[in-house]
Amino acid sequence: MKPYKWNYDYSKTLWMKMYLAEPDFPNHRSKVFITFAEALDIIKTVDNLTLGIPKIIYLVGWQGLGHDDCYPEMEQVNEALKRPEDKTARDSLWWLFEEAKKYHTVVSFHVNQSDAYTATPCFPELVKADAVVKNAKGIPTPIEVFNGRDGYKVSYKGYFESGLFQKNWNRFCDLMPVREAGTVHIDNFCIAQSLNPYTSVEDEDAARNHMLDYIQSCGIDVTTE
């Protein structure tokens, strides 16, 4: 992993997550806690309370039907968060990004590159690229349950070496203001070493470092848990 030149001094910046929505899969809808319009109201209040200090807010549940949906893809904005006056939720998201600047706040994204679901459009590509953790028989194997669905773990080695990570990340940068934000929060960026008999922890760690280097080459800081 290369030495980084950070875009922000995180020791002098208030940075936090904002939980917008989560899936309600049985009813095929998003359970919304905070819309994009309501998020700006909160940002204004926080700015007043903090006397205008620099802030970064990472949006959680901005994609798909909400938190823990669509991973590891990052291109479908949650339509339930849209402002009525906007054509699409993506338009509303960009509006929030621009408006938040007036209140000393950078809006960015909470994303996940460790988990995958069969309903995610790129899941067949992940399997083909050997980018999903498998069992000893070579079969992709779920290891957790999120929102009532089987959750699979991403093999960073296959994900990066196949070029699929770069493809998904470039698409993310083209559609969302993440380059402009200059920072992103990657959730649960762990290594499923004991679950993957085909790669070592050293292989996965090296691939994760390559992913971090790639994101940094796009001019984006990475924060994580």
Where are these regions (language model features)?
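Active-site neighborhood of glycoside hydrolase catalytic domains
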Residues: 156-225
